[in-house]
C-alpha cells in the first residue's frame, strides 16, 4: 500500500474508500506513437506524479534504473511499464502493457502499445477496448509516418477522442513555435480521420512538465495538463443509447424447472417486459426475468453478465443474438469489413477460416480484397493477398447467416476474428463496415465439384484447398 492510499483510507475509512473507488467513472486509454517517443516514460510519470507507486516498487525502480536505465542519473520511469526482458534490454516496448491507476476524480486503465510497425497487430489488440488515444509526438521530429499509422489504426478501431501529447519539449527549449507548427501539421492530417475531438498538449515526460502538474517553463500554454484532460474526457454511456443486443453465451438449465439464456449485454438497457427477437431465426418473446448471481434485476446495463428467461418456449442456442424486436440489425452471410491480418502466412482469398463473431461460431472466407491500406500514407493499393500486420478492405462470405451491427455503432456485434482451422491460431481481426448482397455462384463448376470441394475443405483443412463455391 502506498502512502497516498494509506492516507485516504485513514481519513475516510476502508468501506467509504472502497465505495468511492467503485463508483468512479472509468476511462480506458492507450498510448501510441513512434519508436522512442517516450510512451512508457509518460505512463511511468503519470503513475509517479499521481502517487500510484508503492514503496517497494520505487525502491526496485531505483535499483533497476542504475542497472538498465537509459536516463542517466534520473529514474527511468519507463521500467515501471516495460516488463519483458527483451523490452528492458532494448529500451523499447514490444508487448501491450496494461496498467491501472486512479485519481480523486476517475479510474484509468492504460494500454501501452508498441511503436514498431511489425507489432501493428499488438497495437490493434490494445486499441480495441479503449475510449481515448494519447498520440505521442517527439517535438524534435514532428509528425512522422508512424504517427499517421497509429492515428489511423486508433481511428479504425473506433476511438473517437484523441489527445496529442507533444513530448520532449525540454529538448527544443520549450519552444511555442515548434509546438504550434506540429499542432498545425497534425490537425491538417487528422482531417482524413473519423475522430470527434482532438486536443493537443505540450509535455516533457522525463521531467514531468505539464503531465500531472503545470510547468512554469510552458507559461505560454494556457490549456490543461495531460492528466486534467484525461480526467475531464467525455466517457458517455454511448452503448446505453443503442438498441438491446445480447449475444447468447450458453443455455443455463440447472434443473428441470428453469431454462434461461446467459450472456453479457453488449448494448442497450434491457428491462423486464421488453419484447426481444432471436436472430437469425426471427422468433419473438417477452422477457420475464433478468437473473444474476446477486439476485433478479428490473433492468440491466451494457457490460453486465445476466441470464434472461422468456414468456414463451422458443428455440434459442449459443451464438444466437437477442435484440430489440423493434430495432433489429441486419442478418446476412456477406459483409464488407476492414481486416487487420495477424498471421505469419498471408491471407489468401478463397481460403476457409473459422469465424467467431460475438458468441457465434461459423466458417467463412475472404472473397475479394478490394484494396490494401498503406497505413503510413493512408493510400489505397491493389492487393491479391494480405501479409502480417497489413490492413485491407475485404468482402467476406460466411457459411451461416449472422446478425451484426456496423463496428462504428457497436463494437461487440460488429467485430469478428478469423481462426486458422489447422493450427487454431487467431490470424485476423475484422471490423464490419456494412452487409453485402449475396453473389450468385459462378457456373463453371458442377454441383458435384462444389460439394466435393466443400467436403475436402471440411475434413482435410491441412490441404489448404481454396473454395470454389458456397458451402
UniProtKB/Swiss-Prot annotation:
PROSITE patterns: G_TR_1, G_TR_2. It is an enzyme of class 2 (transferase). Residues 33-40 are annotated as: G1. GTP binds at residues 33-40, 112-116, 167-170. Residues 167-170 are annotated as: G4. Belongs to the TRAFAC class translation factor GTPase superfamily. Classic translation factor GTPase family. CysN/NodQ subfamily. The keyword Nucleotide-binding applies. It comes from the Bacteria. Residues 91-95 are annotated as: G2. The lineage of its organism: Bacteria, Pseudomonadati, Pseudomonadota, Gammaproteobacteria, Aeromonadales. Heterodimer composed of CysD, the smaller subunit, and CysN. With CysD forms the ATP sulfurylase (ATPS) that catalyzes the adenylation of sulfate producing adenosine 5'-phosphosulfate (APS) and diphosphate, the first enzymatic step in sulfur assimilation pathway. APS synthesis involves the formation of a high-energy phosphoric-sulfuric acid anhydride bond driven by GTP hydrolysis by CysN coupled to ATP hydrolysis by CysD. It catalyses: sulfate + ATP + H(+) = adenosine 5'-phosphosulfate + diphosphate. CDD domains: CysN_ATPS, CysN_NodQ_II, CysN_NoDQ_III. Its EC number is 2.7.7.4. Pathway: Sulfur metabolism; hydrogen sulfide biosynthesis; sulfite from sulfate: step 1/3. The keyword Nucleotide-binding applies. Residues 204-206 are annotated as: G5. GO terms for biological process: hydrogen sulfide biosynthetic process; sulfate assimilation. This is Sulfate adenylyltransferase subunit 1.
